[in-house]
């Protein structure tokens, strides 16, 4: 799928990051937001990728040591570490893409 790999954080859960994929960043963030103060998610980074499911799978493999559950997209680690693992996981020709820092 042509789409985006994104990294989400939440101040209520410091030190945790979520790595996921979507076709539409803003729509995806809206699915997380509710009136609960614990649902204040922020998209920290996203990057467009022509095969985001394949790339996400590779990134999740690299992040396994930081996962608490096998099929979970949440990882206990530093945001900069995750960003580095995403960059490492891209094919060399894909690595020309850059992260876009957004507070969506």
How does the language model describe each region?
Residues 1-104:
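Non-catalytic accessory segments flanking enzymatic or RNA/DNA-binding domains
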């Amino acid at each position: 799928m042509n789409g985006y790999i994104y990294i989400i954080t939440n101040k209520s859960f410091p030190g945790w990051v979520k790595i996921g994929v979507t076709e539409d960043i803003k729509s995806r963030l809206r699915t997380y937001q509710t009136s609960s103060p614990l649902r204040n998610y922020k998209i920290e980074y996203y990057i467009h990728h022509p095969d985001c499911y394949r790339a996400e799978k590779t990134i999740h493999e690299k992040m396994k040591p930081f996962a608490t559950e096998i099929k979970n997209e949440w990882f206990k680690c530093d945001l900069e570490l995750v960003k580095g693992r995403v960059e490492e996981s891209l094919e060399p020709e894909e690595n020309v893409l850059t992260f876009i820092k957004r507070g969506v």
